[in-house]
Regions:
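C-terminal capping/extension of enzyme domains
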Residues: 1-30, 52, 97-112, 135-172
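Short, hydrophobic/glycine-enriched beta-strand segments
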Residues: 30-36
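Hydrophobic/aromatic beta-strand patches that form the interior of the parallel beta-sheet core
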Residues: 32, 85-87, 124, 147
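Short loop/turn segments at strand-loop or loop-helix junctions that form parts
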Residues: 36, 89-91, 151
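Short, surface-exposed acidic-centric catalytic microdomains
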Residues: 41-102
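Generic beta-strand or strand-like secondary-structure segments
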Residues: 59, 85, 110-114, 133
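Proline-aspartate-enriched helix->loop->beta-strand connector
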Residues: 111-124
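Alpha-helix capping/helix-boundary segments
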Residues: 129-131
Length: 172
């Protein structure tokens, strides 16, 4: 996708966001992790879970027994090594900042096409909003119900890193 976020948007205004980077997968992918839509920091970096306080990469590295990946190529390699695909439920939406609870005007990604091109048998959503959106817009078409994982977002700081690691172990 080549859509852009409105440059005139302020922190509290509703912005049309179009997913700007592709799903990460290959034909050997067996597990699919789905977020909702990339955060402003992720869109800046051009890759998933780019906010420095988001605990996604730290949690995944611990679950997979890997060194914490620091670069985008290292992150991609870690996921591919463990047959994990990564994408977001939404192709586009309107949103206020990074607040998943403000998401409206949704256009879902074609997740069924990714699943058909892979060996994905299990789908996990990285947060309640991603799970709700997947179940509402995608589950029937895909034919796989998703399991809900706790969000690794800094907004979900009440959940400790230890609890996140424990919850994410089910992807193995």
């Amino acid at each position: 996708m080549t859509g852009k976020t409105s440059k005139s948007a302020t922190k509290n205004s509703r912005t049309l966001v179009t997913h700007e980077f592709p799903a990460l997968f290959d034909s050997n992918s067996r597990v699919l992790l789905l977020g909702s839509i990339p955060s402003p920091k992720s869109r800046e970096q051009g890759f998933y879970y780019g906010h420095p306080q988001n605990r996604f990469w730290k949690v995944l590295a611990q679950v997979l027994g890997e060194k914490l990946p620091e670069t985008i190529p290292q992150k991609k390699a870690m996921l591919k090594k463990h047959h994990i695909a990564l994408w977001d439920v939404l192709e586009s939406c309107t949103i206020v900042g990074a607040s998943d609870t403000s998401i409206e005007d949704v256009v879902p990604n074609k997740i069924s096409e990714l699943v058909q091109a892979t060996h994905v048998e299990r789908i996990f959503c990285t947060g309640a909003t991603a799970h709700k959106l997947y179940q509402k817009y995608c589950a029937e078409d895909v034919g796989i119900d998703a399991e809900k994982l706790p969000s690794t977002s800094p907004a979900n700081c009440a959940v400790s890193i230890e609890k996140l690691v424990e919850a994410y172990r089910q992807i193995l």
